[in-house]
């Protein structure tokens, strides 16, 4: 093998190995490989180099340079679907969803079997509040890759949000077939079961979810709200208190426990939790002013002292 070609390939392959753990070193090796490539006129696919460098630049947070590298690849080959996909990912990360969707669509026009592009385009539609389009493309991603757990999981969540509970149940069952132990799928199954009017099944799924991940705060919230609906306020407090133990930074858990304490006439404890929640979250503090559930607290001395001071 030509010595220069060997050197180029060594640098190029080593850069690829190091890209995730040592992206800056990897980028330096790619640049050295390009230097050899350009000086010696080696026969190698330059687009592959540009795409790899763009990925490196993106990992390093050098978004503008990554965009230029992807665009250079497109100049060389306007039909390079991966370059459009890479651009879409960058705009997606910047929450420029409309622009990201435009590039995802271009990628799948060029490669109709690009399952990752369908999935992330669905996610961009989802984040942008376009639930119908999100469902359409999650379905396509799942069709192209029937082992794509997140396509089924996210599809179930979208169907649940749009009130299509039977479709949501079918999707989450497929997700659980792929990953029966995944806490998020078990959580979503709990949400869907409760929506369908099966609170006991929902409780079962939520408990399984907590066994897999005791630090997912929304599971405690949803489980406690089922007990609230059943007027088992003590059990609701017990569940949400456990959530606070595992996720003490979740302000909404304190807020909801305050509401549960109100139902138990434990007003002093309710005010203390409300103070913690409002200190942690300006949004919750603003919300509480119009929350009628908290009206029994408003004449209490501790409530007046703290929240009058907050207002003034």
What residue ranges belong to the model's regions?
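Canonical tetratricopeptide repeat
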Residues: 13, 52, 86, 120, ...
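Register position in tetratricopeptide repeats
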Residues: 20, 59, 93-94, 127-128, ...
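Canonical positions in the second alpha-helix
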Residues: 33, 73, 106-107, 140-141, ...
